[in-house]
């Protein structure tokens, strides 16, 4: 009986989660990389590698040089730097990328908010990961939520397992790769 309950909760749990691919399967050279084995706080490196289809070690080098990332320390200022690179049409691994959303009135950030109707009233909502995938089922996107980055490729989340489970996380910024 316990096994049936366990398998049923697993099946039901799958319904509430987005399609997910392990970084080790999605990133070229990830499993073989000695750098990856010793690295922590490398979500930006993983998102660049999977989003731009380059190997992990090359992505690590790019993030270190372009974003001034220190080993095992995370990437600070990622969103403004990506926006700046996108606006100046710089490429990463031979691919261009485009900022998603509308430019804010302050001019330095972009908003992915949208209007929806709730009980006859127009309400402004912040874009969540789940809504983003519904609105953008095809394409490759680098996505930032609070203090974290990952890739969404053709509706499949590439990053940490939690990224596919936490569908209601608000997206702070996103870039479409290859546009």
What would you call each of these model-derived segments?
Residues 8, 18, 28, 104-108, ...:
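Intrinsically disordered, low-complexity segments enriched in small/polar residues
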Residues 13-79, 95, 99-100:
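Active-site nucleophile-adjacent alpha helix/oxyanion-hole segment immediately C-terminal to the catalytic cysteine
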Residues 70-147, 153-155, 160-162:
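Conserved active-site-adjacent core of cysteine acyl-enzyme catalytic domains
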Residues 159-179:
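Noncatalytic regulatory segments and standalone regulatory/sensor domains
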């Amino acid at each position: 009986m316990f096994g049936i309950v366990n398998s049923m909760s697993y099946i039901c749990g799958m319904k509430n989660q987005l399609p997910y691919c392990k970084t080790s399967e999605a990133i070229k050279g990830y499993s073989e990389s000695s750098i990856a084995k010793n690295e922590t706080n490398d979500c930006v490196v993983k998102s660049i590698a999977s989003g731009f289809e380059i190997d992990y070690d090359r992505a690590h080098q790019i993030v270190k040089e372009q974003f001034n990332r220190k080993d095992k320390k995370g990437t600070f200022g990622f969103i403004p730097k990506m926006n700046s690179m996108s606006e100046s049409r710089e490429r990463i691994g031979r691919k261009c990328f485009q900022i998603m959303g509308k430019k804010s009135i302050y001019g330095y950030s972009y908003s992915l908010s949208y209007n929806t109707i709730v009980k006859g009233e127009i309400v402004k909502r912040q874009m969540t990961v789940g809504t983003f995938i519904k609105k953008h089922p095809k394409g490759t996107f680098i996505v930032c939520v609070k203090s974290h980055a990952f890739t969404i490729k053709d509706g499949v989340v590439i990053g940490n397992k939690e990224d596919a489970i936490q569908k209601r996380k608000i997206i702070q910024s996103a870039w479409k790769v290859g546009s």
